């Protein structure tokens, strides 16, 4: 069995070793998973693994061990593949068993031929996910992961082979002319496939089919391939992810960290071209639909590489400054949380000061912004999401770049975010809701296909009078449903499918927002900088990177703290509510009490308290009184408009 660092550069060799030892006994599959799991527990081992998020694809060695941080954008139908297949040597008639797991192309040695009728062959099933880089991931998150990755300096991992000088366009060309790769693949190949796994055979046939396949592929690639990213301007690779175990544990929009075998074999493009060609010959009337589905589900490997997953982990968060898993049972995680909680008070005070400056001197608005940024849906009662705290920051300066720069500040604090400029034109034209394309048999992404814990800033300050058309009304309704119910109804043409979410929504507006909000806070600037960009840039440059990192840890960590109300505290709150109603029955309603409890919850968590104290309850009441008084004052100034 290969040893040393071969698990990084030749993972299939490791798999072959276990398969050779165990044969058809399925225990070899469990041993493979356990082997890589143990390898990744070694000191800093995950940092040695090249990441598709950070390393250009053409630097990575085919069939090497890689990782990928991504979101499941779509799930394709399960596919069958040859789990075990048998080859026969044409000269000696010797028979050899091979594994098909973690492969797209079956490997055959010289003079070997695949025996399709072998009784020892087995068919297995795997699931394919279409995965994209995490939408809206902040640049500081990407930079931190790049800086932490040690794969580039690892002497045992070479991903600058002879391919490293080829351009991106050359990669596409290699897909169209796989015969160029013949020397890199000893043994012979034949373009063909069965049950999701392609096999090898006679080399001469490959060359002739490659030339005919080249023309077909050129036609298919004449229009750019849509990588189906939910947000505009996103970069990074999309991947077809082959999952072999426990795929029922994952769902669309989950954020994953994957470890597996990279497959970028150019032969795949030729094989897929042949399948499209064969479909057209069988039924020309249906060839268009089938070709579109084939194009989407089997894009060129140079554009959409394949990852055969050995290990997959659903991520609680993507903040690189925290342990990946915030597990109470894990000592490292507990130690990290304990150490940070001991310095929570000064971090909160500094963050409050920082946000007060960002909000032009308004400390009350800064308090509510902190509560908003640490809020999260912690449970659902029937259809009602508990813990959401959408804030409408009204009173934003008109004809100013304030909202744009405020969003920049938020981008520097949270791991993932997106700013939606709410104009009539955008509402009428943007595709917010994902929809099913039945021709291509895929889920077409929309702007609201976002992973949990994303910060969505909706900027209404650019909204002017105009007419919403039908798509515009649907988009506004989708935003309202997202805010109220924390769900997005994806369009499947014949029906809508509900996708629950956990998105922090901040609405910036001049007057009261057109959209529903849990809390409206009217901004009262204490200063109006003559140059907003210069002011905000100065604010960011004045904060030490170490302090900024503490803000980032603070805002992520507090979302995962448990919070409970004891029976005594619940009784005290109820009694206080009754007393407030006695003094002025009109001053507080059941909805006001619910709002007060939400504010008290996040206020307690913001200081590291996991239950409600009398001090925090009184502070929450004081904040709410100040906020309402400010709204009332603004109402008297502007009439009914807030």
UniProtKB/Swiss-Prot annotation:
Compositionally skewed regions (Polar residues) per UniProt: 151-161
Entry keyword Phosphoprotein: yes
List of residues that carry Phosphoserine: 154, 167, 298
Phosphothreonine: residues bearing it: 160
GO MF: chromatin binding
Positions of the UniProt region annotated as Disordered: 151-196
Keywords per UniProt: Cell cycle, Cell division, DNA replication, Mitosis, Nucleus, Phosphoprotein
Primary site of residence: nucleus
InterPro entries, sorted: MCM_complex-bd
Gene Ontology biological process: cell division; DNA-templated DNA replication; sister chromatid cohesion
Gene Ontology annotations for the cellular component aspect, listed alphabetically: cell junction; cytosol; MCM complex; nucleoplasm; nucleus
Localization per Swiss-Prot or TrEMBL: Nucleus
Protein family according to the UniProt entry: Belongs to the MCMBP family.
Functional description taken from the UniProt entry: Associated component of the MCM complex that acts as a regulator of DNA replication. Binds to the MCM complex during late S phase and promotes the disassembly of the MCM complex from chromatin, thereby acting as a key regulator of pre-replication complex (pre-RC) unloading from replicated DNA. Can dissociate the MCM complex without addition of ATP; probably acts by destabilizing interactions of each individual subunits of the MCM complex. Required for sister chromatid cohesion.
Assembly mode: Interacts with the MCM complex: associates with the MCM3-7 complex which lacks MCM2, while it does not interact with the MCM complex when MCM2 is present (MCM2-7 complex). Interacts with the RPA complex, when composed of all RPA1, RPA2 and RPA3 components, but not with RPA1 or RPA2 alone.
Protein name: Mini-chromosome maintenance complex-binding protein
Organism of derivation: Mus musculus
């Amino acid at each position: 069995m290969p040893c040393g660092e071969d698990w990084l550069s030749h993972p299939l060799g490791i798999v072959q070793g276990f398969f050779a030892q165990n044969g058809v006994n399925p225990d070899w599959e469990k041993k493979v998973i356990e082997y890589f799991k143990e390898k990744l527990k070694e000191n800093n081992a995950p940092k040695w693994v090249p990441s598709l998020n950070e390393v250009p694809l053409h630097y990575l060695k085919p069939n090497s061990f890689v990782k990928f941080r991504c979101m499941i954008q779509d799930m394709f139908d399960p596919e069958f593949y040859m789990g075990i297949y048998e080859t026969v040597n044409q000269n000696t008639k010797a028979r050899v068993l091979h594994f098909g797991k973690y492969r797209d192309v079956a490997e055959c040695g010289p003079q070997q031929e695949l025996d399709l009728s072998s009784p020892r062959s087995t068919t297995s099933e795997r699931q394919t996910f279409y995965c994209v880089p995490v939408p809206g991931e902040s640049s500081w998150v990407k930079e931190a992961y790049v800086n932490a990755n040690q794969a580039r300096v690892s002497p045992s991992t070479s991903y600058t082979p002879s391919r490293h000088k080829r351009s991106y366009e050359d990669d596409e060309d290699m897909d169209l002319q796989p015969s160029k790769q013949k020397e890199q693949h000893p043994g012979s190949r034949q373009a063909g496939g069965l049950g999701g796994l392609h096999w090898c055979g006679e080399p001469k046939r490959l060359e002739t089919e490659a030339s005919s396949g080249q023309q077909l592929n050129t036609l298919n690639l004449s229009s750019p391939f849509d990588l189906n990213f939910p947000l505009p301007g996103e970069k990074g690779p999309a991947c077809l992810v082959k999952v072999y175990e426990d795929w029922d544990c994952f769902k669309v929009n989950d954020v994953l960290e994957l470890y597996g075998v990279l497959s970028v074999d150019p032969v795949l493009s030729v094989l897929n071209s042949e399948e499209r060609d064969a479909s057209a010959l069988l039924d020309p009337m249906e060839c268009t639909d089938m070709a579109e589905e084939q194009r989407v589900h089997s894009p060129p490997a140079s554009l959409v590489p394949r990852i055969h997953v050995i290990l997959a982990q659903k991520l609680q968060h993507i903040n690189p400054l925290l342990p990946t898993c915030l597990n109470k049972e894990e000592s490292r995680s507990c130690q990290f949380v304990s150490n940070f909680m001991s310095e929570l008070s000064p971090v909160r005070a500094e963050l409050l000061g920082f946000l007060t400056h960002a909000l032009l001197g308004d400390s009350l608005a800064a308090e509510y912004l902190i509560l908003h940024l640490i809020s999260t849906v912690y449970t659902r009662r029937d259809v009602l999401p508990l813990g959401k705290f959408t804030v409408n920051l009204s009173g934003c300066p008109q004809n100013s770049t304030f909202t744009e720069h405020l969003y920049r500040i938020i981008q520097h604090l949270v791991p993932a975010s997106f700013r939606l400029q709410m104009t009539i034109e955008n509402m009428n034209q943007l595709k917010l809701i994902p929809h099913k394309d039945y021709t291509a048999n895929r889920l077409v992404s929309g702007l609201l296909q976002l992973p949990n814990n994303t910060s969505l800033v909706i900027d209404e300050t650019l909204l002017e009078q105009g007419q919403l058309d039908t798509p515009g009304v649907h988009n506004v309704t989708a935003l309202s449903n997202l805010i109220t119910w924390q769900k997005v109804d994806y369009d499947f043409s014949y029906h809508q499918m509900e996708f629950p979410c956990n998105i922090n929504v901040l609405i910036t507006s001049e007057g009261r927002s057109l959209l529903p909000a849990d809390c409206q806070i009217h901004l009262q600037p204490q200063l109006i900088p003559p140059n907003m960009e210069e002011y905000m840039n100065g604010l960011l440059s004045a904060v030490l990177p170490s302090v900024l990192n503490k803000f980032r840890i603070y805002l992520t960590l507090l979302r995962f703290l448990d919070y409970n109300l004891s029976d005594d505290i619940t009784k005290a709150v109820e009694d206080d509510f009754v007393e407030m109603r006695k003094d002025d029955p009109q001053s507080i309603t059941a909805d006001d009490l619910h709002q007060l409890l939400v504010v008290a919850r996040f206020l307690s968590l913001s200081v590291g308290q996991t239950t409600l104290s009398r001090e925090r309850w009184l502070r929450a009441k004081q904040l709410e009184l100040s906020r309402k008084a400010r709204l009332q004052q603004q109402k008297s100034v502007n009439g009914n408009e807030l």
